[in-house]
Amino acid sequence: MAEKVAVLLGGTSAERDVSLLSGAAVLKGLKEAGIDAHAIDIRDFPAMRLKEEGFDKAFIALHGRGGEDGTLQGVLEFLAIPYTGSGVMASAITMDKLRSKYLWQGCGLPVSPFVALNRAQMDAGLDAQLMTSIDALGLPLFVKPSREGSSVGISRVNQASELQAALQEAFRFDDEVLVEAFLSGPEYTVGVIGTDILPSIRIQTASEFYDYDAKYLSDETQYFCPSGLSADQEAELRELTIAAWRALGCSGWGRVDVMMGADGQFYLLEVNTSPGMTSHSLVPMAANQAGMSFSQLVARILELAD
């Protein structure tokens, strides 16, 4: 009897619209691969009902909180339904940029200089010591919520007078915020499928940084795959990807984002354990470069579900 697969999409996070697009593409690809797949929007369908509705596996096409942060993974573990992507712990950690950075630092892996702030510090007013630490990062800099994806809530700060507004914007989305030093780029991303490392992609955007519009809406963002790195640089990036992936305990599939600094070194940005699968998405692009069609890609990801 064929497996019945739930493609979990939509949800209630700030990335709902992107998830709906990803889920629709995944559903189409799975059906093309001959898989009995069904779209399930967990905003309207309680995940606890998946077992009683006869689903054997779950393809997680959710992004952001509630779908990518270990919450749903825990429910699926309880139901004993195999699912795509990383487990509970790795999903929770990778959703949290701050704790990902702490872990990478502890493993001796390169991350951009940063200052962590919480809401209590913000409400009390940033003291002289914190401001000195932020000033030491230089300008421009980036302000990011710790636990959001798709560049939601991120601002680039070019002048000191812009910092307060950027912090207020980031704190709309989370109680913890990162203030990061600017890295000149370019930005690279590397897909991981099981034990396979996909070719790197170089991202070139017309905007100040790779924000939500550049990721999902703009036709001016350029993607280069092959990325133009030398063989030695590609090997270095591959090894960094593997080290970052393993340090956070990731499994299944995902994407590691890095930035190159002015010193020519790679610095880790974040790991996505449920990357976008839209027409602008990067893992399908890299998989295609490696000779894998979209339907082959989603079928392979589903095979890795456990």
Swiss-Prot record:
Example GO molecular function: metal ion binding
Q: Which cofactor does it need?
A: Mg(2+); Mn(2+)
Q: What is the cofactor note? A: Binds 2 magnesium or manganese ions per subunit.
Residues that, per the record, bind Mg(2+) 1 = D257, E270
Q: Which InterPro entries does the UniProt entry name for this protein?
A: ATP-grasp, ATP_grasp_subdomain_1, D-Ala_lig_Van_CS, D_ala_D_ala, Dala_Dala_lig_C, Dala_Dala_lig_N, PreATP-grasp_dom_sf
| Family statement | Belongs to the D-alanine--D-alanine ligase family.
PANTHER family the UniProt entry points to:
D-ALANINE--D-ALANINE LIGASE, D-ALANINE--D-ALANINE LIGASE B
Q: What is this protein called?
A: D-alanine--D-alanine ligase
